[in-house]
UniProtKB/Swiss-Prot annotation:
Coiled coil: none annotated. Its main location: membrane. Disulfide bonds: none annotated. VirB proteins are suggested to act at the bacterial surface and there play an important role in directing T-DNA transfer to plant cells. This is Protein virB3. Keywords: Crown gall tumor, Membrane, Plasmid, Transmembrane, Transmembrane helix. The chain crosses the membrane at residues 22-42. Belongs to the virB3 family. It is a single-pass membrane protein. GO terms for cellular component: membrane; type IV secretion system complex. It is found in: Membrane. It comes from Agrobacterium fabrum (strain C58 / ATCC 33970).
Length: 108
């Protein structure tokens, strides 16, 4: 019962997502696809200048937390889709309602 646990070093690079010019690949792919849609729809490449502040804003967010883009995308896939959140209470980690309605839950 005196077995010692082995220690293994976990490097920071093993926990980070892959970055492209300081932005995670998933977010970079979305921004590049959005740039393509802008060129196709507007047919003027000067509107691509709008994406430069978005790119640098994404870099600023990712400087603080490498997984921030993944957290936002996960939110959009779960709670962002609940358009009837006011009626049913939305997506929550807790099974209990956060705030109880004035008329009670489930009573007409």
């Amino acid at each position: 019962m005196n077995d010692r646990l082995e220690e293994a070093t976990l490097y920071l690079a093993a926990t980070r997502p892959a970055l492209f010019l300081g932005v995670p690949l998933t977010l970079a792919g979305l921004l590049v696809m959005f740039a393509g849609f802008v060129i196709v729809i507007v047919q003027n490449p000067l509107y691509e200048v709008v994406l430069v502040p978005l790119w640098f804003g994404a870099r600023l967010v990712v400087e603080r937390d490498y997984n921030a883009a993944s957290v936002v995308l996960l939110f959009l896939q779960t709670a962002g889709r609940s358009v009837d959140g006011l009626i049913w209470g939305g997506a929550s980690v807790s099974p209990n309602p956060i705030k109880v309605p004035a008329r009670g839950r489930g009573m007409a």
